[in-house]
């Protein structure tokens, strides 16, 4: 009985080592269509106008609708001042 369990344990260990030691091809991800997108450093900014009372920025989004975001770090200096929304960082700058 001990010999059978020892043999099956040894077989499982050898199979696991074989799976771990199998080399992975470097091009296997790109061949399967799983390559990384080249959009990681693309900065899309949208210009708009800020409003001092609520400290918000209103801008036209990509969909064409008016979007609103709260100004980040600096307060809006006056109504109608220039602001921009950075879609990469997800923050508004007034």
From Swiss-Prot:
Signal peptide: 1-21
Subcellular location(s) of the protein: Secreted; Host cytoplasm
Annotated GO CC locations: extracellular region; host cell cytoplasm
Swiss-Prot/TrEMBL keywords: Antimicrobial, Disulfide bond, Fungicide, Host cytoplasm, Secreted, Signal
Main location: secreted
Cross-referenced InterPro entries: Antifungal-protein_dom_sf (IPR023112), Antifungal_prot (IPR022706)
Cystine pairs: 50-76, 57-83, 69-71, 92-94
Family, as annotated: Belongs to the antifungal protein pafB family.
Official protein name in the record: Antifungal protein
Source species: Aspergillus giganteus
């Amino acid at each position: 009985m001990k010999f059978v369990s020892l043999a099956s344990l040894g077989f499982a260990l050898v199979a696991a080592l074989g799976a771990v030691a199998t080399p992975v091809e470097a091009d296997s991800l790109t061949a399967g269509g799983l390559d990384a997108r080249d959009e990681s450093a693309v900065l899309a900014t949208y210009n708009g106008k800020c409003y001092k009372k609520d400290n918000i920025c209103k801008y036209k989004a990509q969909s064409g609708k008016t979007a609103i975001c709260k100004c980040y770090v600096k307060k809006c200096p006056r109504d109608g001042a220039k602001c921009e929304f950075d879609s990469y960082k997800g923050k508004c700058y007034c």
